[in-house]
Swiss-Prot record:
Entry keyword DNA repair: yes
Any single Pfam family the record assigns to this protein: GIY-YIG
Organism: Bacillus cereus (strain ATCC 14579 / DSM 31 / CCUG 7414 / JCM 2152 / NBRC 15305 / NCIMB 9373 / NCTC 2599 / NRRL B-3711)
Name this polypeptide is given: UvrABC system protein C
One GO process term, biological-process aspect: nucleotide-excision repair
Family per record: Belongs to the UvrC family.
Compartment(s) where it occurs, according to its Swiss-Prot or TrEMBL record: Cytoplasm
Domain GIY-YIG: 14-91
């Protein structure tokens, strides 16, 4: 531990507050809160930790803290600091998980819609629904029963919905505010749990129509009742009080936390939310951070009641969220909390099982690949691929797989320097020479297997450099593609012999991943360089544009297309003098063929 950290720890206060961990660049990498700052911060630098926490601690070179008057104030401050600094070790719940709602618009002639965006627009929103199908089924039923307008824009004549009895045709007929209000009130009653009452009313109307020998009408009403029964059958009642509540449960294992939320609406369990993330604090602190971020998500309405596990300070949750929070000791609510806890525990167990299974498969694939090639297990594999289009900007890329997984910090990109024109073999010789000359000089780890994306010529070129120039004898294989440019087989040895792998084997899938990854990495690098050169060559003939201004324009606009669409003012904003901006604008707008 750095000496100045020890000094800071010694004077840290015994009070609640937030702490900000910083790396050597002074960047905030983690924000936490504590009831007692001194104890919490010290805990990071004492005792044993799991791998994730050790990585965090390994990056900490400084910290600061903010004292608060209460744990509640610390919780609020923590959320604001996380939003401000976006530290890489903090969880940041994304707003990408949204649920569908049924909306009654506030238009003069209201409509029923399904939306995932809840706005403050005077519309009435009902939900969330567990999925789009459930929302669409409910809306379809309401459309059949209640004749609000269906068209987005008012047509000039009545549509099919009018003839089906599902619209009052406000496009050509007068529909009063009172008529619409009556329909809207019925829909609201239905969506607020009054479907049984609506069903009873429809049943009475069905019998009345039957007695009047209005059999078509009776059949329509019977079908509506059947639709209600079918939809409500999918939404079984689990609570009789019809209160909207969110029930939380969580589990912690191997430095990870899983939180499960059950959404109970009008007595029905309609959906659950599952979140998994690494945790560096005590579980209770991690849960409080999660729940604060959870309700900042615009798709998560605060219900009337929040139910939390017994280990959580429900009074703090209640004051923080300004919603009734309960900690049940018995009964149905406690059963639901325990069910959420159980689901969270199972989800974590499944996560670790899948990780272990995938690791086992990957290690076996690496081992089997070595046996197929007649070499020792290739724990470290390095693969090379060249990329050029019509001989321009030739590049090469190297990727590394360690224990069958991509090690992206080991990836390398190369601009071809000594080869003129499109010569794949000489390009491969140059890159292999540069890569392993440097590896020897820096005493870097050498691979157990080198894979060259290419045939016999590529393999011969790379082997010549490796063995005859550098004196290295590392197993090397060529990765041959079929006529569809897909992975076909390997070649190895001198002379090269084909090694055919089972196409459904794990080692074949491993080779496919390696080939796809090295090709992706090479082509991405090539496109970056090609894009830059196109811009620079297009600017070569413009007076007043040298290398420095080319770089500025490239950085600001990113592409020639954006430059051609830019105004004079935008070139000035990019740092060009007014007269130069006018010259660039005139030149690019005149050169239509660029």
């Amino acid at each position: 531990m750095h000496e100045h950290l020890k000094e800071k720890l010694a004077i840290s206060p015994d009070q609640p507050g937030c702490y900000l961990m910083k790396d050597k660049q002074g960047t905030v990498i983690y924000v936490g809160k504590a009831k007692v700052l001194k104890n919490r911060v010290r805990s990071y630098f004492t005792g044993s930790h799991d791998g994730k926490t050790l990585r965090l601690v390994g990056e900490i070179v400084d910290f600061e803290y903010i004292v608060t008057s209460s744990n509640l104030e610390a919780l609020i401050l923590e959320l604001n600091l996380i939003k401000k600094y976006d530290p890489k070790y903090n969880i940041q719940l994304k707003d990408d998980k949204t649920y569908p709602f049924i909306k009654i618009t506030a238009e003069k002639q209201p409509r029923l819609l399904i939306t995932r965006n809840v706005k403050k627009d005077k519309g009435k929103y009902f939900g969330p629904y567990p999925n789009a199908q459930s929302a669409h089924e409910t809306k379809k039923l309401l459309d059949r029963m209640y004749p609000l307008r269906k068209c987005t824009n008012m047509p000039d004549k009545v549509c099919l919905y009018y003839h089906m009895g599902q619209c009052l045709a406000p496009c050509v007929k007068e529909v009063t505010e009172e008529q619409n209000k009556e329909i809207v009130d019925e829909i609201i009653k239905f969506l607020n749990g009054g479907h049984k009452e609506v069903r009873s009313e429809l049943e009475i109307k069905m019998y009345e129509a039957s007695e009047k020998l209005e059999f078509e009408r009776a059949k329509e009403l019977r079908d509506q009742i059947a639709h209600i029964d079918a939809i409500m059958e999918k939404q079984k009642m689990i609570m009789s009080d019809l209160v909207d509540r969110d029930v939380f449960g969580y589990a912690v294992d191997k430095g990870w936390m899983c939180v499960q939320v059950f959404f109970v609406r009008k007595g029905k369990l309609i959906e659950r939310d599952v979140s998994m993330f690494p945790i560096y604090d005590e579980p209770e602190e991690g849960f409080l951070t999660f729940i604060g971020q959870f309700y900042e998500n615009s798709s998560h309405f605060k219900p009337k009641e929040i139910v939390v596990p017994g280990s959580i300070d429900s009074e703090l949750v209640e004051r923080f969220l300004e919603v009734e929070a309960t900690q049940p000791k018995r009964g149905k609510k406690k059963d639901l909390v325990e069910l959420a806890n159980k689901n969270a525990k199972i989800a974590l167990e499944e996560k670790f099982y899948l990780i272990e299974r995938d690791e086992e498969r990957t290690i076996k694939a690496v081992d089997h690949l070595g046996k197929q090639l007649g070499i020792e297990t290739p724990y470290r594999i390095e693969a090379f691929d060249n990329s050029n289009i019509q001989g321009t900007n030739p590049v090469s890329a190297m990727i590394a797989f360690i224990d069958g997984k991509p090690a992206k910090k080991e990836y390398r990109k190369y601009k071809i320097k000594t080869v003129q024109g499109p010569d794949d073999y000489e390009s491969m010789r140059e890159v292999v020479r540069r890569r392993y000359t440097r590896a020897l000089k820096e005493n870097s780890p050498l691979p157990d297997l080198i894979i060259i994306d290419g045939g016999k010529g590529h393999l011969a070129a790379a082997s010549d450099i490796l063995e005859n120039e550098l004196g290295l004898y590392i197993p090397m294989a060529g990765l041959v593609k079929d006529d569809k440019h897909k992975t076909s087989h390997l070649i190895i040895g001198d002379p090269p012999e084909p090694v055919m792998l089972e196409r459904n084997s794990q080692e074949f899938y491993l080779l496919q991943r390696i080939q796809d990854e090295v090709h992706r990495f090479a082509i991405t690098f090539h496109r970056q360089l090609h894009g830059k050169s196109v811009i620079q060559s297009a600017l070569d003939d413009i007076p007043g544009i040298g290398d420095k201004r080319k770089k500025v324009l490239l950085k600001h606009f990113g592409s020639l297309k954006k430059m051609k669409e830019a105004s004079i003012e935008e070139f000035v904003e990019a740092g060009m003098p007014k007269n130069v901006a006018e010259t660039i604008y005139t030149y690019l707008t005149d050169k239509k063929t660029l």
